[in-house]
Amino acid sequence: MRFFPKSIAVVCVLSLLITLVAPLNGIVQAASARPDKSSVGMVMSTQKIANDIGMQVLKEGGNAIDAAVAVGYALAVVHPVAGNIGGGGFAVIHTAVGENVTLDFREVAPGKATWDMYLDKDGNVIPNASVEGYLAAGVPGTVAGLSAMLNRYGSKNLATLIQPAINYAENGFNVTARQAETFNEYAPRLKKFASSKQYFLKSDGSNYKEGEVFVQKDLAKTLRLIAQKGPDAFYKGEIAELIAKDMSANGGIITKEDLAKYKPIWREPVKGTYRGYDIISMSPPSSGGTHIIQILNVLEGFDLKSMGYGSSQAVHVLAEAMRYAYADRSEFMGDPDYIKIPLKGLISKDYAAEIRSKIDLNKATPSTDVKPGQPAMHEGTNTTHYSIVDKWGNAVSITYTINDYYGSGAAVKGAGFLLNNEMDDFSIKPGVANIYGLVGGDANAIEPYKRPLSSMSPTIILKEGKLFMVVGSPGGSRIITTVQQVISNVIDYDMNIREAVDAPRVHMQWQPDELRIEKNGLVKDVVNNLTVMGYKVVTRGNMGDVNAILIDPSSGIMYGSGDPRNEF
């Protein structure tokens, strides 16, 4: 297993040496910078300020869980497109003593939610009703989730960990170029809501530009209340009052009772194996871990290394494995507290062998010919992710979200934070795609207090019981395939973590029936071959924003990589 590119020597952390662009089999890939390196702990998120805050916690003797809480609140301030206290997510935790657990702090549907709440009198979907505004929001889980993690595994107090976020909200921070782009892109949505316009645009109505200082006084006040009074301030106290009042005034349905009822859930992780490595990931209501394992199980029967990274054959079997997994996702996945999910069947090696037997090595299978399988017979995205490992070997993989960039676009008046639009992750009408193009069925229909299906895939990998990789990504429907490809790049193709993250990605999700590739990702001959095989190859924008840490089991040295696709 390589931890650095063969062509360069190990030098200090955060070096950014870039070499020439070179083809690798069927992929056009820029040669990667060396990974970041550390022996005392590592934090990888999409935002430098948040990384620095997390690392400071580790330097001051905090553990990975302490750092995860501090980073979560920091991202709510310095990464408002996705960092949040108005959304929810999932955490996978590995402790130094070998415990593996997951925490579900996904949003839930309000108590007044109904299966047809986004349909008109003729049964048609009301445009944007599940995407924009107060009615699109589920009951947030982030604040409860971060506190649940801290209470069980943390070593520091909440007030100490939130204080850096309060400081940046109170005093402001300099807007980056990428943040300025998103402010400009999503200004039309934010301007629709008076509180959001007040918080995220300048007083003259113009957008914040690169280098300007962005201050969030009301958010600082909200965070201070949480620091002083804990999650009860959010779910039962002053902040709950503000949320309920704003909902009532703007057509939303979240009530104080809904907030008071919210509870995060500790769940058993979904577990699998791949070529001798143990995969530990998030179980339902996230579909991520289940289908990462399902795809890897199918691929395990192919010699990917001999096929060649980026070759027509390797991309073909990968796309077919993805196609079958997403077909099953549409049929079987939902909130396990409301439906029975054939989980053991979906992740079984026998079921993977059955899928593999259906793959024609010479041609693509039309998605119309792929139906959800019978996994029970085998019983026996926008979002942000961060990965943290401490010097003792505790690790946290967290993906949390308000769904779309800037969520529903609606901010809570007087509280300074955006509400999610996670209700769009339900099947608002079976057979109708959501904003990510995903088609759902009755298993994911709206019900009061139900958790919507997710693709979030925080994942931890062990090798012979020792911590090996912490990985995850945002990206909506592409999260599953993004994380799976990074894992495969390391295990199958012997890439170091920077190369594995930088490598071009492909995506197939059953419906729509198209193979998505990144710009300049596949060489022309491979695209032509795949087209002849029957694929509709479509070039899309960047896929995912991985933050990953690879640990050398023999030395304990950590190697980290952020994603060059979406740097904030």
Which residue stretches match the model-derived regions?
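Bacterial N-terminal signal peptides that target proteins for export
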Residues: 1-12
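Sec-dependent signal peptide cleavage junction
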Residues: 18-33
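Noncatalytic scaffold domains of N-terminal-nucleophile
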Residues: 31-52, 64-65, 69-229, 234-236, ...
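Alpha-helical support elements that line or immediately flank enzyme active sites
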Residues: 57-58, 144-152, 229-236, 241, ...
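Active-site rim segments in enzyme catalytic domains, especially the processed small/beta chain
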Residues: 77-102, 253-255, 395-463, 493, ...
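Short, small/polar residue-rich loop motifs at catalytic or cofactor-binding pockets
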Residues: 265-266, 380-383, 453-456
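Internal maturation/activation junctions in enzymes
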Residues: 302-402, 414-415, 430-431
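Extended C-terminal subregions enriched in glycine
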Residues: 450, 492-541
